[in-house]
Curated annotation (Swiss-Prot):
Family matches, as SUPFAM superfamilies: EF-G C-terminal domain-like, P-loop containing nucleoside triphosphate hydrolases, Ribosomal protein S5 domain 2-like, Translation proteins
Family: Belongs to the TRAFAC class translation factor GTPase superfamily. Classic translation factor GTPase family. EF-G/EF-2 subfamily.
Protein name: Elongation factor G 2
Cellular-component GO terms for this entry: cytoplasm
Gene that produces this protein: fusA2
Amino acid sequence: MTRKTPIERYRNIGISAHIDAGKTTTTERILFYTGVNYKLGEVHEGTATMDWMEQEQERGITITSAATTAFWKGMAGNYPEHRINIIDTPGHVDFTIEVERSMRVLDGAVMVYDSVGGVQPQSETVWRQANKYKVPRIAFVNKMDRVGADFFRVQRQIGERMKGVAVPVQIPIGAEDHFQGVVDLVKMKAIVWDDISQGLHFEYRDIPDELLATARTWRDKMIEAAAEASEPLLEKYLAGEALSEDEIRQGIRQRTVANEIVPMLCGSAFKNKGVQALLDAIIDYLPSPVDVPAILGHTEDDKTAERHPGDNEPFSALAFKVMTDPFVGQLIFFRVYSGVVKTGDTVYIPGKTRKERLGRLLQMHANVRQEIKEVHAGDIAAAVGLKDVTTGDTLCDPDKVIMLERMVFPEPVISQAVEPKTQADQEKMGVALHRLAQEDPSFRVQTDEESGQTIISGMGELHLEILVDRMKREFGVDATVGKPQVAYRETIKQAVKDVEGKFIKQSGGRGQYGHAVLNVEPQPPGKGYEFVDAIKGGVVPREYIPAVDKGIQDALTAGVLASYPVVDVKATLVFGSSHDVDSNENAFRMAGAIAFREALRRARPILLEPMMAVEVEMPEDFMGHVMGDLSTRRGMIQGMEDIAGGGGKLVRAEVPLSEMFGYSTTLRSLTQGRATYTMEFKHYTEAPADVSEAIIRGKGMGRQ
């Protein structure tokens, strides 16, 4: 089956923004005007099509990137039909992972800004992610009808805060209650939308006299930006010749695709103004799959290879999202970079070194699905029937294997114990957690070997709260969540010699006799436990020596200060004695444990706490507040640097994990939400005396 739309007319775009900038409403309007959705969905009524999880509608925030397809022929019917694949992305910082994974598979992005709030924290994070994946973008300043709306302030903020070159291709006509429409600077015409038809009808008018001078000023700036795209355009511009509308669009497109400028538009999605012009700009200025560089990967013999976006190339695709659907089970969303794949085809998954057969292929409109028989280069689709695929996996032709660059996901920064309320919940919880971890690579599940508890880890308090909530709603699992916990360790500071351990019971019948003498000394950090047999003359029979080692390992599981595991010690068995009848393995195991615990008490035991490498990215103005706060958390500043591309400052510090709980909330309020941070385990270090004493008291332990 041949493709219906040539690949040059595809646009794979994401719609990204800070929470509450009106991103979901903008997407809804796009679906309405492209004819997919006939009744407008409103987020504040809880009916928006893209926000399809129950929780998203309740909270009014977008959690999951839903993918949908729309077709557009231009607001004046002046284009051949284009196919626009849209990925809606969340704007809450705990869901940054969703934005990151969609950026990886996009060719272009629409950044939605609130005309009053302007460039907000998540906008900066999303901008950095778009820079990382070199995604060309256009800006849509939304909510122009709000009190305090200021299009030009947002234009300045994009330059000041994100060092982006924002080039208005429209300016607003009026603002707040008087917002009527926009001036199209390319055509030099006013566009006014009609309220009665929900913005379906519009007309071109002459620019109001009071705006003419402003429009000319901004048009000159736009033409200058367009002219810098190529030598011929620049020569024409410098010679004082007028550039045609097509030449202006061509120049702006070239520079947008090259990530040199960001065209700016405005409107009010809620009031149905400006969205069709935004659709035209997506076609005019954002790239098709053939306008961006070929995707790179590695062959089986680890040579670099590339795949070009064409149907005649070998099939290659990237799975960018795994979801559990209540009707069809697991859905794998994937972006096809090259080739064609049909229902029933076998694909190879290089990361898992296995083949799988594609079941049904679906194209999604939010959570409404349409079954299709094949997908082509440039398409985004969902597959049913792939068993062992996780987010970030490559799917490819089994005969032409390529492994596309994997997505890198941040390590989780918060952990909590989770316990099922009933035995029935216990079995279901295992299945639920496995499913959720498959869907979300930033969510981890592990079992604490010491307590046997299930520990869940994620990107923030809201992240874990929503996942626990999903366990209840989607899998019927009731669970209680504990407070965040820190894994402390114990070790020793000095060496001790000739510490004796005896386990002797000899009162009638067969007795017990074990006797071991140990030297115990500290090891360098990270060296772990070491056992040395230094017995001479057979005073401890050979067959009992492994039992002494086993007894010491038993004692390692709980130290003498607060029952935390003991690390980095060396134990040498130097002497002992045995009894011909009463000695056995168990007696020597007990003797080894007794000697070792006594050695720990004498060897200046200390508590170790985990230190985290923390990196905070923020605008420079907040650096003093952030560094002051890190110091109060016993943090040690390791360094500072400018973020490449003028995106503020990066502070690196080492901070004890115990001081980092609740940090996301504090950081948000310290920086008006304009900072982001990452945290990963670095090493263990000695806890200060006051901290140790508090922990020991908290565990109800004195020195044993």
